């Protein structure tokens, strides 16, 4: 009887942490994407960022389905998102093309990361009213990551411009309906 009770309690605790486990999977995939960039494996980094996006998509769904949304989960999600959709895509594009610009490439890579962090901090203190203010970092990060595939087809200035535009869109006052 004791064993069944202990097993039941363990299952309940695990269920309560399912969303956070997915969130940490997002973080892990983003971290591995950064390491892949550092080792020159840019295509692998691209794949890992998109897998992180899948984990990020499901963590919120799981939290709502099991009614386990929490302030801790919200904060953890933002910390993971800055890695997977801020740092990882920025470094992917930096190594892929922006490095050719020297200091401006470096500055706008860091600018993108800073705008992403600001966007997440603003989100964490705002009321949830069915709208986002500014483009979500997950959207900006996926666009930046996807643009890596276009490097052979566009002039390098396009990518520098894209990073600036995505950065400004993340911190813009534009209201976007949540989907």
Where are these regions (language model features)?
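C-terminal membrane-associated helical module and adjoining short loops/tails
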Residues: 1-7, 11, 132-179
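Helix-coil boundary and interhelical linker segments in multi-pass alpha-helical membrane proteins
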Residues: 32-48, 83, 87-110, 146-160
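Multi-pass membrane catalytic core of lipid/isoprenoid biosynthesis enzymes
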Residues: 14-24, 65-121
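Topogenic membrane-insertion module of multi-pass membrane proteins
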Residues: 1-57, 172-179
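N-terminal TM1-TM2 helical hairpin plus the immediately adjacent luminal interfacial "cap"
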Residues: 35-41, 57-74
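C-terminal ends of transmembrane helices
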Residues: 8-9, 59-70, 115-129, 168-179
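Active-site His/Glu-centered metal-binding helix of metallohydrolases
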Residues: 28, 54-62, 79, 83
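Alpha-helical transmembrane segments of multi-pass membrane proteins
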Residues: 49-56, 111-119, 148, 163-173
């Amino acid at each position: 009887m004791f064993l069944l009770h202990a097993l039941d309690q363990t299952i309940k605790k695990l269920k309560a942490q399912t969303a956070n486990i997915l969130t940490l999977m997002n973080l892990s995939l983003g971290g591995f994407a950064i390491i892949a960039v550092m080792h020159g494996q840019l295509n692998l980094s691209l794949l890992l960022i998109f897998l992180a996006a899948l984990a990020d998509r499901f963590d919120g769904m799981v939290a709502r389905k099991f009614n386990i949304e929490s302030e801790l989960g919200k904060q953890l999600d933002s910390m993971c998102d800055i890695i997977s959709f801020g740092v990882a895509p920025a470094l992917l594009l930096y190594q892929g093309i922006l490095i050719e610009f020297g200091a401006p490439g470096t500055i706008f890579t860091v600018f993108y990361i800073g705008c992403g962090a600001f966007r997440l901090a603003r989100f964490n203190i705002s009321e949830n009213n069915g709208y986002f203010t500014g483009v979500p970092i997950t959207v900006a990060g996926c666009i930046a990551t996807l643009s890596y595939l276009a490097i052979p087809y566009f002039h390098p200035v396009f990518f520098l411009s894209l990073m600036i535009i995505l950065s400004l869109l993340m911190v813009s006052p534009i209201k976007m309906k949540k989907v």
